[in-house]
A protein has these predicted regions:
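N-terminal loops that bind phosphate or other acidic moieties
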Residues: 1-388
């Protein structure tokens, strides 16, 4: 996926979670190397280092110019003598590949690859390990837990932590990364380890760009499945401190099909509502008995969320309780802005609030109901008849 103009010229694969043989690496070197030479970009795993290193020595014996760099961007286990290579490798692929495409010589590409490696940091988190074909799955991560710092081959991480949603997961990852990040601008890469859904990755990315390091993040790559671990249900985050021209090299066009592009991070542009869509609200008014009654009703709906969802699941999609609880919470939050002392206006205000905060058929039906109740009340009907 990363072979193309402006990135890699070749990739050498072994069996699943096994390094390629030295002969396979040598064959690739001999097939693609010209007078300018060849740069091997290798993740820091023992088999890869040995086989690529041996192949490089053999290629040099044939008269080829071959350099090799080792990517060791994992920060999960700081006491490990040899840090593992993770998705920060993609920064090396892109920057060295763009430089080579622009005509830089082997030594310049190598020195910049080493600089990028030194500037890159990565860490991952997953809800589950991966399934290796023809091997029993290691179910070491209990339900409701996540493992922080595991490797791309399923290697154990630094600790297991409670799984408390996207914002909490990003916070745990970012806290580790932030401690190693120098001041200045960075690029971030958010990587799907294999089985996370598009929705999950989007939520994780939103949480990342809402975190306390966002002021230091100038560019983002992903979210995308860039360095996967088969069906691992997790993600990793990589950061790299930017130097001169790095943003240009990262943004440079490539024909490699798996590269998702590098985009500038910018604040979300929020536009005002067009004329006619901004709601016209009547002045708020206080009435404690009405407020207490409405609050009690809303609290009852919130408490009944799970029961209502279970009932709805028998014939529908199981979200009625969640929908009503969301609307009830919004109504409680808006309570002090409602015209509680004027029931006619209150019905209409509740309908307007529900139309804005409650989705699905329930929202529009209840909005119509309360609007009709407001009309009936304005026509002089008592509360019981207005609500029929």
């Amino acid at each position: 996926g990363f072979i193309g103009k402006g990135m890699l010229t070749a990739a050498v694969c072994g069996d699943i979670f096994a390094s390629p043989s030295a002969n396979a690496v040598l064959a690739a070197i001999l097939a693609v190397s010209g007078p300018s030479g060849c740069l091997l970009i290798v993740k820091n795993y023992t088999g890869d280092r040995l086989n690529f290193g041996l192949a490089a020595e053999r290629a040099r014996a044939f008269g080829h110019k071959v350099n090799m760099v080792i990517v060791d961007d994992d920060i999960a286990l700081p006491d490990l003598p040899q840090a593992r290579g993770l998705a920060g490798t993609l920064f090396v692929h892109k920057i060295a590949g763009a430089m080579a495409e622009n005509g830089a010589d082997l030594d310049a590409c190598t020195s910049n690859a080493l600089r990028v490696i030194n500037a890159s940091r990565s860490i991952g988190m997953s809800l589950d390990t991966c399934t290796v074909p023809e091997s029993p799955k290691e179910n070491r991560i209990p339900y409701g837990m996540a493992e922080l710092g595991l490797g791309i081959h399923g290697e154990a991480g630094i600790e297991q932590v409670a799984s408390n949603g996207a914002a909490d997961a990003i916070s745990k990852v970012i806290d580790r990364l932030a401690a190693t990040m120098p001041d200045g601008a960075h690029v971030v890469l958010i990587n799907n380890l294999g089985a996370a859904t598009v929705l999950e990755m989007s939520i994780l990315t939103h949480s990342l760009l809402s975190s306390h390091i966002v002021d230091r993040i100038k560019f983002i790559v992903g979210p995308a499945a860039l360095m996967t671990a088969l069906d691992m249900h997790g993600f990793s985050v990589s950061v790299m401190a930017l130097s001169t021209d790095d943003d240009t090299l990262l943004s440079q066009t490539t024909t490699a099909p798996a590269w998702p592009g590098c985009k500038a991070v910018a604040a979300t542009l929020v536009l005002p509502l067009p004329d006619g869509l901004s709601p016209v609200r009547v002045p708020a008014s206080a009435h404690e008995p009405t407020k207490a009654f409405l609050t009690k009703c809303c609290e009852q709906l919130i408490a009944s969320k799970d029961d209502l969802n279970a009932l709805d699941a028998k014939s529908g999609d199981g979200d009625t309780g969640s929908t009503l609880a969301t609307a009830a919470s919004a109504l409680i939050d808006a309570m002090d802005s409602l015209p509680l002392a004027d029931h006619t206006q209150l019905y209409r205000a509740i309908g307007l609030e529900l139309s804005q905060t409650m989705g699905g058929s329930s929202g529009v039906l209840l909005a119509i109901f309360f609007a009709a109740a407001g009309d009936a009340s304005s026509a002089g009907k008592p509360m019981r008849e207005a609500l029929q």
